[in-house]
Structures are given as C-alpha cells and as structure tokens.
From Swiss-Prot:
Transmembrane segments: none annotated. Residues 369-386, 558-569 have a biased composition (Polar residues). This is Uncharacterized protein C2orf81 homolog. The lineage of its organism: Eukaryota, Metazoa, Chordata, Craniata, Vertebrata. Residues 1-23, 225-235 have a biased composition (Basic and acidic residues). InterPro entries: DUF4639. Keywords: Phosphoprotein. Signal peptide: none annotated. It comes from the Eukaryota. PANTHER family: CHROMOSOME 2 OPEN READING FRAME 81 (PTHR34438:SF1), SI:DKEY-97L20.6 (PTHR34438). Residues 1-32, 151-190, 222-241, 366-396, 551-571 are annotated as: Disordered.
Length: 598
C-alpha cells in the first residue's frame, strides 16, 4: 500500500512538470493611452467613476434649490398684489381722462419747405410719331383758296352771313358799266339785313351789308320809322316801269333758280331764314307753305325791298350788252358751317297747337268769330258732360307772373321755334319771354301794398334806385308793368276762363339768389365788385369792400332798397307723362324767402 502511494505521487510530479513545459509563456497586456504619455486607460476609468458621484450630488442640490425658489416666489406675489392693483387703477383713470380731453393735432409745419413732402418728378410720355406701331399717315386735303378767303373775310360765328353773302350774291353781282340812276324804284330780290337787325340798331348807327362786295357798302340807318316808310314806299310801282319790270324779274328769277338749286339745300335755307321773334314778328302760315313748295318762293321771303342801286341784272336794251354767267361755281359744304341745335330735356306739349301754332308762340292767340263760337260750343259741351257740382269758393294758387321759361340753348339770340333734331314733331318751343299768367286778376288792394322790408340792411349802388323800386313793387303786388312804348294788355273774361297761358311783357329780372353753406367764416371773405352775399344767421347783406369803403367815407348812397327773388324752378316733365295722352306739368316749390310774407 505504501508502495502504491509513492508511485502515484511520483506520477503527479512527472505530469505537472510535463504540463508546465508544454504551456507557452504569457505575454504582457499592452496599456492603451487616452492622452499619449499623460493619461492612460486606467486613470480615465478612475476619473469617470469620480465624476459619476459628483453628478449625483449636483442633481440632489438642484432639486432642493428649485423647491426653495418656488416657495419664495409665492411669498413675493402675495406681498405685491395690493401695490399692483393700485398702479393698474391709476393708469386706467389717466387714460379715461385723456380720452375726455383730446388735444388738437396741429399737423406738419413748413410742409412747402420740407423736401420730403415734395411731389415725385414723373417723366413726360414721348409723343407718338409716324414710326410708332400702328400709326398711319394722314393726308389732309387743302381747302380751295376762295373758300378760305371768304372764311377770313367774314365774321366768325355767323353762318347766315356767309351763306347769304357767298352763294347768292356772288353770282348775281358782276362789274358793269354805271348807268344813269333812274327815279323809278325797282324791286331786286336779293338777301339783305332783316328788319330785326335794323330795329336792334340805334338811330344813327351804320349797318354793314352781309355779303362781301368790293365797295363794302355801309347803309346809314337814321331811324326805325324812316326805314319802314322807305320800305313801304318801294312797294309802290310806277306806271312807266310796269312794262319793263316783268322782264327784269323773269331774268333774275331764272338766274337765281339756276344757281340756288346747285348750291344750297333745304336745310341750309332753313338755317338762313329769319325766325319769328318773341317781340311779335308777323310771319304768316302762307310763307311756310311757299318755302317748302318752290325755291323761288322761299327766296322771296329772304329777299327785301331795297332802294334802286346799280345792279348786275338789268335789261339788255338799257345796257346794250348781255350779262355774263360764271362757268365754274363752287359748291359749299354745309357740314363745315357752324350750327346751333337746341337739345331740350323735356318738351312742352300744347293740345291746341294744330289750330293756331304761330299765334300761341307769339303769346296772344287770335280769336276770330269762328274760333270764339267753337270755343264756346266746346265749353258748353264739357259743362253738359261734367256732373253738376255745387260751387265752392276755394283759393286758387296761380303761377307767378315772373316765372319764365329759360332758354334751353347757350346763345340768347337763338330762336327756340326751330325744331330740334332729337324730336320728330314740329312743335315750336316757348320763347324766353313767355310767361304763365294767373286766371284770376289780383285785387287792387294787394297791388297797392307797400314794398315789404325783405332785407333791412341791403344797400343798392348809386344809379339803380328806380330799377330797384320797380322790382320791389313787382314782387310786392305781382303787378304787370308794360315796357316803354306799349300799352298794358287788357285781359278779357273769355281769355281768363280759357286757361291758356298768355304772353306777359318783358320785365327787368333781378339776379337769381343761390343758397349755399359756406365752409369758411363770412367775415374773412373778400367779395369782388358786383357780388353780394346774404348772411341768414345775422340777417345782413355783405357787400364788396369798395361799397363798404364808400359808405365809410360818407359818399352819397342810394336809399335803402330791397332785392327780390325771381329765380323759379324750371318745370319738370317725366317720360311717363309725355307718353300719356294728356300731358301734365308742374312747378316744384321754391325755398321760402326770409320775411317775404308770402
């Protein structure tokens, strides 16, 4: 047993030594440097374990500090609650007070001198020339020399003078040998100045012949009566000239007929015709029929009876030679001549226009025996058809006598009897002097009332006392004052009941008044001479500085006068009423005049 134990111990030693001899030698582990030569891996691991402990301690301290600061802030808010409420209330009260008392904004000062307020300069657009895209050159045809010379010689704005002077008398007048002046008056149908032109001229004035003659004849007009007397004297024919006169008239008619149809149209002739005036020119209906029937008849209306003058149309037996004719004539373009057309907004319709159109236009319709009987029958028929009603005296409100129909065109001399192209009817319009008169006359006690004191402080300039007093009487009593040289119109009972508008004489109209709200103080305004302003608040009439200066210096002023109001609103007619069978028109009420009493 002992032998076996020793053997085992010996075997173990042998095997251990063999194993140690067979095991390779262990190599040392190389060290990794984090920072070469300064910090190795073992030192880095030791530092990281130390920082982890510091981070844990820092988190614990931060949590503790946060809890302490929250408790301190809550205590601070509790202490500042009352002071904050007081400060907010103070600011609110100050803001409300500032809203109640607003300060005025003076704006910018010296804006004109500030360069930042100037307007930016904008370059001008280039003009379009012939090289622009889409531009087409236009060739203007030059007008004939004779037409341009006639336009320069004639006065501008007078188409009647150009038509009468260039187309009618140019052919008829030829330089002829002067013949012996005969004592026999001759009738030469050539266009001359109408009776209206002579009546408008004062005695002693000179009127120029419309057509352009080489001699430029000037006719001296001594007076209206002498002109009418000479015109009537020329209508008397002497027995010696009765044999030669038909030949002269026939020759002149043939010459006029050959040149008239090729130069002027019916429209041009209508423009050249003297229209009837509101003063009472007597143009019969027969002349209108002759105007449309033949050119010779229309020429007779345009022509006037003139004294015997050296004329181109004389008998061949007297002159010994035949008159020459112009071979080339120039045709005038009527579209190039200036025209005045009236385009009214509304047309006043009169039912009885077909019966007496010209009489209604002149103002007083002629009432013949047949017309009176017809009107009487019509009134009886209407009274029989209408049911009988008890007569109740009710106040009537007639239109004012001063209510005039204003002219619809800009030219005051333009006659409104001419038909407008916008209307197809031949209804003549009312003249500017046409007025509606009341159906019942005004009692004499009303007409004799004194002039009311409309404007107590109004002062009229010197030299207008009579006109102002007359206007005041017209406004106070609505009296009719006939013009100078005419008798007052007597209104018959038949005309009063007819209800038709009658023509009142021309009266002096005052300047229309305009109510307006000034944007500046009236005391600071400077009025130009001739302009006055009525202050309704102070009931004072503001005059220009020149009149005030005269009043302060003590110059004699006119007695206290009162201006009147003549501006009446125009009648307005709507389209629906024009289309109806029975037209209706009314006047809009005007604004009341202060202290007028009406």
């Amino acid at each position: 047993m002992s032998h076996e134990g020793s053997r085992q111990a010996r075997d173990r030693g042998v095997t251990r030594s063999k194993a140690e001899k067979a095991r390779p030698p262990t190599q040392p582990v190389p060290q990794v440097d984090i920072v070469p030569g300064r910090l190795n891996e073992a030192e880095w691991i030791a530092f990281m374990s130390l920082e982890e402990g510091e981070d844990v301690v820092g988190d614990i301290l931060a949590d503790l500090m946060t809890r302490v600061m929250e408790c301190a802030f809550k205590v601070y808010l509790t202490q500042q609650c009352v002071p904050f409420t007081i400060s907010q209330a103070r600011e609110a009260m100050l803001q409300i007070t500032e809203w109640r008392f607003l300060a005025r904004d003076e704006g910018e000062s010296a804006v004109a001198e500030d360069p930042t307020w100037g307007e930016d300069e904008e370059p001008l657009a280039c003009t379009t020339d012939s090289w622009a895209q889409g531009s087409v050159p236009v060739l203007h045809t030059p007008a004939p020399v004779c037409v341009e010379e006639q336009f320069h010689n004639e006065e501008p704005g007078n188409p009647d003078q150009f038509l009468l002077g260039s187309s009618w008398d140019k052919e008829s007048q030829k330089p002829t040998q002067p013949s012996e002046p005969s004592a026999e008056p001759k009738v030469t149908p050539r266009p001359t100045a109408t009776l209206e032109a002579f009546e408008e001229a004062e005695p002693g004035d000179a009127l120029e012949v419309p057509h352009g003659q080489e001699g430029s004849h000037m006719l001296a007009v001594p007076s209206k009566e002498s002109l009418r007397s000479t015109a009537e004297g020329e209508r008397v024919y002497s027995p010696q000239s009765s044999l030669k006169q038909p030949q002269v008239v026939r020759l002149q008619a043939s010459e006029k007929e050959s040149s008239f149809g090729s130069h002027l149209s019916l429209e041009d002739l209508y423009l050249c015709m003297p229209q009837p005036d509101a003063a009472g020119d007597r143009l019969s209906l027969q002349s209108k029929g002759q105007l449309h029937s033949s050119p010779i008849g229309s020429e007779s209306h345009l022509g006037a009876l003139t004294p015997a003058e050296p004329s181109a149309f004389q008998e061949p037996e007297v002159l010994g030679e035949r008159p020459k004719h112009k071979t080339t004539t120039l045709r005038m373009d009527s579209s190039r001549l200036p025209r005045h057309w009236v385009r009214p907004v509304a047309e006043v319709l009169i039912p009885d226009l077909e019966v007496h159109p010209l009489e209604i236009y002149r103002g007083r319709p002629r009432r013949s025996q047949a017309g009176t009987a017809t009107s009487a029958c019509e009134s009886q028929a209407l009274s029989s058809r209408a049911p009988s009603k008890p007569h109740v005296s009710s106040p009537r409100f007639p239109l004012q006598r001063c209510a005039t129909f204003r002219a619809l065109g800009p030219d005051p001399s333009l006659n409104l009897a001419q038909t407008s192209p916008s209307f197809g009817s031949n209804v003549p319009f009312l003249s500017p002097g046409f007025r509606f008169l009341p159906r019942n006359p005004i009692p004499p006690d009303v007409a004799s009332t004194p002039t009311p004191k409309l404007w107590p402080l109004a002062k009229w300039p010197s030299g207008w006392e009579r006109e102002a007093e007359q206007l005041g009487e017209l406004w106070a009593g609505r009296t009719r004052v006939p013009p100078q040289g005419q008798e007052p119109v007597e209104v018959t009972p038949l005309e009063e009941d007819s209800g038709w508008p009658l023509a009142a004489p021309q009266v002096l109209e005052a300047t229309s008044q305009v109510l307006w709200k000034p944007m500046v103080i009236s005391e600071t305004m400077k009025l130009v001479p001739g302009v006055s302003m009525w202050n309704r608040g102070t009931q004072e009439l503001l005059n220009p500085a020149v009149i005030r200066k005269e009043a302060e210096e003590g110059t004699p002023q006119a007695p206290e006068q009162q201006p009147i109001q003549t501006g009446v609103s125009k009648p307005q007619v709507i389209m629906k009423q024009i289309r109806n069978e029975t037209p209706k028109a009314w006047l809009l009420p005007t604004k009341p005049v202060p202290h007028s009493g009406s």
